[in-house]
């Protein structure tokens, strides 16, 4: 019985070791990679029928490449190259920047959408992954027409 009590009694050194291991495990869990990092840039305001350039910069922290399709959606129809859809291979060492030129004659809300898709012939050797958790990312901006 006494031997059993000695086995189950924790020494201060053991408790300190367990605490350090627990703190180290929590720090490791916080170090997750971001699937998509996006920066959508459009002017805040323009005059009616001025040409607008929208810029979407996309990158990833994943070690594997992904096939992404990017496009814009608006609250009202717009003229120009607004409806262009881009498909590209996105890797951590090769961020992508996409451009759209269009005309706006009234205030509009614009969403830049990034879909992670499965498509052959885009990434080298067709080596690409699709995230399980999320495969659609977006950001919105308002373009004021004065």
From Swiss-Prot:
Positions bearing carbohydrate: 105
Subcellular location: Secreted
Keyword flag Lipoprotein: no
Keyword annotations of the record: Disulfide bond, Glycoprotein, Pyrrolidone carboxylic acid, Secreted, Signal
A GO molecular function held by the record: IgG binding
GO annotation (BP), single: detection of chemical stimulus involved in sensory perception of bitter taste
GO CC terms in record: extracellular space; nucleus
Signal peptide: 1-28
Chief place of localization: secreted
Cysteine pairings via disulfide bonds: 65-91, 89-123
Modification type Pyrrolidone carboxylic acid: residues: 29
InterPro entries hit by this protein: Ig-like_fold, Ig_E-set, PIP
Family, as annotated: Belongs to the PIP family.
Subunit relationships: Monomer. Interacts with AZGP1.
Name used for this protein in its record: Prolactin-inducible protein homolog
Native species: Gorilla gorilla gorilla
